[in-house]
């Protein structure tokens, strides 16, 4: 399925991911991850990108974020990943690309916000690295379960309004449907919004673009050909 030009929706959650170039281990040690998290904290706060959740793996990263300004997502990742690439190349006496292309992202409705956050925090569990999400120290799960400090610029307000440690533990323990995992991956890869038909229709009306997958025939022409569509919704 073709990848859409990126859609950034102010005050709407997004799932975001990016891999290391050639899937190389760019976050292999605790020292590298600490450098990365310090940069991430700096730039999400500077550019007003609310960080609701994250997970750092050895060769890729996942986030659930809410941009509070039109360029918050692009600038935060551009500067975090640019500065980290300079650090990593210097530390490894290397040169060239550290990150694989541009990041992937998709807007989320209110239900899929939590589905995506669960998906992000269960990443190390699916990979067989830990038995429970909170055992992985380099994700937001540690803060959500009270075993780590939200020192990465993590925005806990929305999570606290909806969850407690006990209810979040139950939600993660309930597991993920394969259909949910597939939907998150597909929408993130293509850039299509993940949500109800009503949610997607709202975004289509605002962007003047066809965002729902077409059912065969000739593909519809986008009505807005900008590289990135920026919307603003009320908080």
Model-predicted regions and their roles:
Residues 60:
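Glycine/serine-rich anion-binding loops at beta->alpha junctions
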Residues 1-57, 66-235:
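Short Pro-Cys-Gly-centered "Cys-loop" motif that presents a nucleophilic cysteine in a tight turn
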